[in-house]
Curated annotation (Swiss-Prot):
Region ranges (Hexokinase large subdomain): 229-476
Entry keywords, A to Z: ATP-binding, Chloroplast, Glycolysis, Kinase, Membrane, Nucleotide-binding, Plastid, Plastid outer membrane, Transferase, Transmembrane, Transmembrane helix
Protein name: Hexokinase-2
EC top class, as a word: transferase
């Protein structure tokens, strides 16, 4: 009896020790996994670091590439396209002008009424239409005929107060967001289609001539006064209300910048010098690349798997299309190596681009004590229903690292433009005002990003220059901006 009791006690003690060891091992396993997650975060943070010294190197590299791109075609990663816009709006324009904005599967037609000197925009309205899929792969004639038909409908429905005086044509600004080789303010040949369009017989043709032909067929008495890109349109929209606007930056799905350059500082410009002495340059800065950019293994992997490997590197670390995807890639590694979402890797986390930047922004801005928004987003998008508060905090930290790097690099890019314009040091007469027209959903809606960008540029310019920089939100460059460029490049401008 005694032996049995002793045996039972021994077995019981051994079992208790085994359970305790298991619990201990589990705890140690959890803590070592958490240490791994923190190590991945720390390494990522270090590789994304953007100290002021590095940002100044990026800005200098941007300036060097700008010089090279202005010197010759193909001389730089930056295309530095001549926009042929040498007359930006002054705010004195008056009359009724139109815009056609073709940027993807939808297009818009706008009518804008301007009030003349200090009158601003009196009236604006627009109509939107989607392009049937068969016309995206059909013929040039069919596509432009469809667009002209919608334009005709829009004009037919307008009130008499918008009719032009006898003998005067309506004037239109045409925003065409596809790669073109611009040949004048109102002509340009299509280089290639993107965004799901594939109409071979338009390639190499002047898109303004194609639209004009279609408008004549529909008996629309309208001329295209300006063929523009949305970034140049943003610059025009900003200048209309503020004469100090000289730079425009779009930070949305993609990113681009345009600025006002002295015509004499463009060696590749062989035409007559414009009366204004100025020319707007469309930088196409998304393609900027430099050894100073802080790229990580996640960026390289994302680039390799993209449709355009090796291209648009700056865009891939700064713009809305990609920030959420970078976050997803880091979270996936943490899930695989540190089990931050449990033993199994959530299957949805393996889907490229499932985590969009608006969702990342919502998580980054979550101020609730239990980070409820983060929990909801993880559950709704990735089907992760049991995230711990510790893990949610980790997610917010990652959002901050990704957004901060992007915003600070965008600020460095703007500093590069300011340097190229020679406005980065104070003049004897005091600092010159630099107004940057900003547009795009990323800038407009991701507050932490835009706040970081603005603070960084002020920091980089230094105290003396900090008061000279102003950011202005200029909405709808591709619509209103195009109509304003039609106004400032009107053939009737001398008649007013």
């Amino acid at each position: 009896m005694k032996k049995a009791t002793v045996g039972a006690v021994v077995v019981g003690t051994a079992a208790a020790v085994a359970v305790a060891a298991l619990i201990m091992r589990h705890r140690m396993g959890k803590s070592s996994k958490w240490a791994r997650a923190r190590a991945i975060l720390k390494e990522f943070e270090e590789k994304c670091a953007t100290p002021d010294g590095k940002l100044k190197q990026v800005a200098d590299a941007m300036t060097v590439e700008m010089h090279a791109g202005l010197a010759s075609e193909g001389g730089s990663k930056l295309k530095m396209l001549i926009s042929y816009v040498d007359n930006l709006p002054t705010g004195d324009e008056g009359g009724v002008f139109y815009a056609l904005d073709l940027g993807g599967t939808n297009f818009r037609v706008l009518r804008v009424q301007l009030g003349g000197k200090d009158g601003g925009i009196i009236h604006q309205e627009f109509a939107e239409a989607s392009i049937p899929p068969n016309l995206m792969v059909g013929t040039s004639e069919a596509l432009f005929d469809y667009i002209a038909a919608e334009l005709a409908k829009f004009v037919a429905e307008e009130g008499e107060e918008f009719h032009p005086p006898p003998g005067r044509q309506r004037e239109l600004g045409f925003t065409f967001s596809f790669p073109i080789m611009q040949t004048s303010i109102n002509s340009g040949t299509l280089i290639r289609w993107t965004k799901g369009f594939s109409i071979d017989d338009t390639v190499g043709k002047d898109v303004v001539a194609e639209l004009t032909k279609a408008m004549q067929k529909r008996e629309i008495d309208m001329r295209v006064s300006a063929l523009v890109n949305d970034t140049v349109g943003t610059l025009a929209g900003g200048r209309f209300t503020n004469k100090d606007v000289s730079i425009a930056v779009i930070l949305g799905t993609g990113t681009n910048a345009a600025y006002v350059e002295r015509a004499q500082a463009i060696p590749k410009w062989h035409g007559p010098l414009p009366k204004s002495g100025e020319m707007v340059i469309n930088m196409e800065w998304g393609n900027f690349r430099s050894s100073h950019l802080p790229l990580t293994e996640y960026d390289h992997a994302m680039d390799t798997n993209s449709l355009n490997p090796g291209e648009q590197i700056f865009e891939k670390i700064c713009s809305g299309m990609y920030l959420g995807e970078i976050l997803r890639r880091v979270l996936l590694r943490m899930a695989e190596e540190a089990g931050i979402f449990g033993e199994e890797v959530p299957p949805k986390l393996k889907n490229s681009f499932i985590l969009r930047t608006p969702e990342m922004s919502a998580m980054h801005h979550d101020t609730s004590s239990d980070l409820r928004v983060v929990g909801d987003k993880l559950k709704d998008i990735l089907e992760i229903s049991n995230s711990s508060l510790k893990t949610r905090r980790l997610v917010v930290e990652l959002c901050n690292i990704v957004a901060t790097r992007g915003a600070r690099l965008a600020a460095a890019g703007i500093l590069g433009i300011i340097k190229k314009m020679g406005k980065d040091t104070p003049r004897e007469s005091g600092p010159e005002k630099i107004v940057v027209a900003m547009d795009g959903g990323l800038y407009e809606h991701y507050t932490e990003y835009s706040k970081c960008l603005e603070n960084t540029l002020v920091e980089l310019l230094g105290k003396e220059m900090a008061t000279s920089i102003v950011f202005k939100h200029a909405n709808d460059g591709s619509g209103i901006g195009a109509a304003l460029l039609a106004a400032s490049n009107s053939v009737y401008v001398e008649d007013k």
